[in-house]
Amino acid sequence: AYQDVNFNDDGTKMYTISWYDDYIRQYTLSTGFDVSTASSSYSSLSIASQDGLTNGMTFTNNGTRLFVAGDSSNSIIEYTLSTAYDITTASHVGSTSVASQATAPESVAFNNAGTKMYVVEKSNHNVIEYDIATPFRLNSETGTVGTILRGTYGTLTLNSNGSYTYVADSSIVGLDANESVIDYFNYTVSDGTATDTAELK
């Protein structure tokens, strides 16, 4: 049985999630938001290794992160997508337990800024609100120098000399005049002897 349905920003991709087999399925729509034009074939992403009873799902505004409500694990499961809204490029980042507040989470949503997360708790029919320190980030990511780290609006590469390169996603080209967005990266680096922690934005 399908538990949730979602679309990309222009409605040309549709996603369903099923607790029966723990798969997210991605369909292409030739006409945006018209389900009668959905392709018969689909791409899929298995959530089974992270949770055995998945419910709701949501994407970040630019489609580079995916969050799934895991009923059996009482957690929110987080993925990064190297290509926006393409679940075949998804990588599991981690799972965040909400068991102490939300038993059997049924759905998950964020405010536009990604600084608040809302989880529908099935057992007692509550909506639980969480503050998020770094927008749309529930789990930290690790990597070596030169590794590309995905942000909300682009990617960051840290170099061995302490410099960095940031590449903005093409999606932000659509910003209106005088409109801006901010990406946040909290990082800790170590050379085996000393460590340093900082925030880039």
List each language-model region with its residue ranges.
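Short loop/turn segments immediately following the C-termini of beta-strands
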Residues: 19, 71, 122
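Acidic, turn/loop-rich segments in luminal/extracellular domains of secretory-pathway
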Residues: 141-201
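Short loop/turn segments immediately following beta-strands, especially the blade-tip
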Residues: 26-37, 79-88, 129-138
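Surface loop/turn motifs at the tips and blade-to-blade linkers of beta-strand repeat domains
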Residues: 45-50, 96-101
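Residue-level detector of Asp-centered blade-edge/turn motifs that repeat once per structural unit
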Residues: 7-10, 61-62, 110-113
